[in-house]
């Protein structure tokens, strides 16, 4: 079996590690928020895997076919054909990115304030758009310790799901969001059995199921590798079965469509398509372009298929595994097993002296940048935000620092540099301090907040 990447590199971008004193200056000027760092001041950028990957020669060549017609562009129909072939959903709407899809979907599905939206676990923008639409997001993730092995740690707790529907009434639930893979839980996969059971419960009570499928191809790979009965199936066939257990999807195409910009909505039912589509035109643009150029639609259509290639998926997940094993072997506490797109360091265990409301996950992001120029992001109580009713900080189930690996960008030597940076920071962990707010936005605060050392 080949050990190398299933591609050759045709173009390169220079990167460098700036001196420590320059990193200290850059972090201070960024108000101790990695989102405000200039990319030129970052050596290895693991802030996100969203839109940061490298496109293939086939995607670049497809962009030359882009039809820039305002309505009815041929590029849209090529994308629609691809989406329908993979998902079985006939009604397809492109959006400028995933949060555009979330915005229009929840604005139409949450029909009155206080309705619940249930999920195996929301990511930041999804949670934010539920709240902005007047809804209440509820996480129903299974409870497994970070250090304990479980093949599908992203699963919905179906017992709690059914209990919640019974107690609060199906009429008070706007929809169920099944997130695959489960980013906030550590990029963890969801089993086909769990997806099927969730859909059966939803149908029993007449509740809509939408997939959040930014990393659906990675989830299909994990099902193929870990779930009985799927080892001999191609990822596209696993995807088709998975989508049969839902009513529609929202997608940030910047992950498993392997593009730098774009999103999707797709539905099985014309009535649902019409309802949600009514909000697309004023927010995103006409239904056949959704805020994107035709060339972006072409690249997305190609990338959706490339992401389901078994060789690509083995490389992709294997690279994340490589970094995770280096850290775990060095005694770094991480979410285990590692997920499909990132390694999640358990910052609460890495920095036990930092209180949860001084955001150990964020404190560690600052330390990793200072130590080795590596940019990462917090996934924990900072990202979750405040209770909209009490105004108090909500303590998250995890305090993670996420090391998200862009697709087809870095080599394993880069990841060895990352591992060395984390290990060096671990040896100095008692010197790392928490943070406090210098300026706190009300919505999605982690993106634009300013901090000071605590």
UniProtKB/Swiss-Prot annotation:
Keywords associated with the record: Lyase, Pyridoxal phosphate, Tryptophan catabolism
E.C. number: 4.1.99.1
The protein's required cofactors: pyridoxal 5'-phosphate
Top-level taxon of origin: Bacteria
Pfam families: Beta_elim_lyase
Reactions that this protein is recorded to catalyse: L-tryptophan + H2O = indole + pyruvate + NH4(+)
Classification via SUPFAM superfamilies: PLP-dependent transferases
InterPro entries from the UniProt entry: ArAA_b-elim_lyase/Thr_aldolase, Beta-eliminating_lyase, PyrdxlP-dep_Trfase, PyrdxlP-dep_Trfase_major, PyrdxlP-dep_Trfase_small, TNase, Tryptophanase_CS
Pathway annotation: Amino-acid degradation; L-tryptophan degradation via pyruvate pathway; indole and pyruvate from L-tryptophan: step 1/1
Signal sequence range: none
GO function terms (MF aspect): tryptophanase activity
Enzyme class: lyase
Residues where N6-(pyridoxal phosphate)lysine is found: 255
Similarity field: Belongs to the beta-eliminating lyase family.
NCBIfam families the record matches: PRK13238.1
Subunit structure: Homotetramer.
Protein name as it appears in the record: Tryptophanase 1
Native organism: Symbiobacterium thermophilum (strain DSM 24528 / JCM 14929 / IAM 14863 / T)
Taxonomic classification: Bacteria, Bacillati, Bacillota, Clostridia, Eubacteriales
């Amino acid at each position: 079996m080949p050990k190398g990447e299933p591609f050759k590199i045709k173009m390169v971008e220079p990167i460098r590690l700036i001196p420590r004193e320059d990193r200290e200056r850059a972090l201070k000027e960024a108000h101790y928020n990695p989102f405000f760092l200039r990319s030129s001041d970052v050596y290895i950028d693991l802030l996100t895997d969203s839109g940061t990957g490298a496109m293939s020669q086939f995607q670049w060549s497809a962009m030359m076919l882009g039809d820039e017609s305002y309505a009815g562009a041929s590029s849209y129909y090529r994308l629609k054909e691809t989406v329908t072939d993979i998902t079985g959903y006939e009604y397809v709407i492109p959006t400028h990115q995933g949060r555009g899809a979330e915005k229009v979907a929840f604005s139409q599905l949450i029909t009155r304030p206080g309705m619940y939206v249930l999920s195996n676990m929301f990511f930041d923008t999804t949670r934010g758009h539920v709240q902005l639409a007047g809804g209440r997001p509820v996480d129903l993730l299974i409870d497994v310790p970070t250090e304990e092995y479980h093949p599908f740690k992203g699963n919905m707790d179906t017992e709690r799901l059914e209990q919640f529907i019974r107690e609060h009434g199906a009429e008070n639930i706007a929809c169920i969001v099944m997130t695959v893979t489960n980013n906030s839980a550590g990029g963890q996969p969801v089993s086909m059995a769990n997806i099927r059971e969730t859909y059966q419960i939803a149908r029993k009570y007449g509740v809509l199921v939408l997939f959040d499928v930014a990393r659906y191809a990675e989830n299909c790979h994990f099902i193929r590798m870990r779930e009985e009965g799927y080892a001999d199936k191609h990822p596209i066939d696993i995807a088709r079965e998975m989508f049969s257990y839902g009513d529609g999807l929202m997608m940030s195409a910047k992950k498993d469509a392997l593009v730098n910009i774009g999103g999707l909505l797709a539905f099985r039912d014309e009535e649902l398509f019409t309802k949600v589509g009514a909000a697309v035109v004023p927010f995103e643009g006409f239904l056949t372009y959704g805020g994107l150029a035709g060339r972006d639609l072409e690249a997305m259509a190609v990338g959706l298929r490339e992401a389901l290639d078994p060789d690509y998926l083995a490389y992709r997940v294997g690279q994340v595994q490589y970094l995770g094993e280096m850290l775990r072997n060095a005694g770094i506490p991480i979410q285990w097993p590692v997920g499909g797109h990132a390694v999640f360091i358990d910052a609460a265990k890495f920095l036990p002296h930092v209180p949860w409301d001084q955001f150990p996950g964020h404190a560690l992001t600052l330390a990793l940048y200072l130590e080795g120029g590596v940019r990462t992001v917090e996934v924990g109580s900072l990202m979750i935000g405040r209770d909209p009713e009490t105004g108090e900080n909500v303590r998250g189930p995890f305090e993670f620092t996420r090391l998200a690996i862009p697709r087809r960008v870095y080599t394993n030597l880069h990841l060895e540099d990352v591992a060395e940076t984390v290990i060096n920071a671990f040896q100095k962990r008692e010197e790392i301090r928490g943070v406090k707010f210098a300026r706190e936005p009300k919505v999605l605060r982690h993106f634009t907040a300013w901090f000071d050392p605590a």
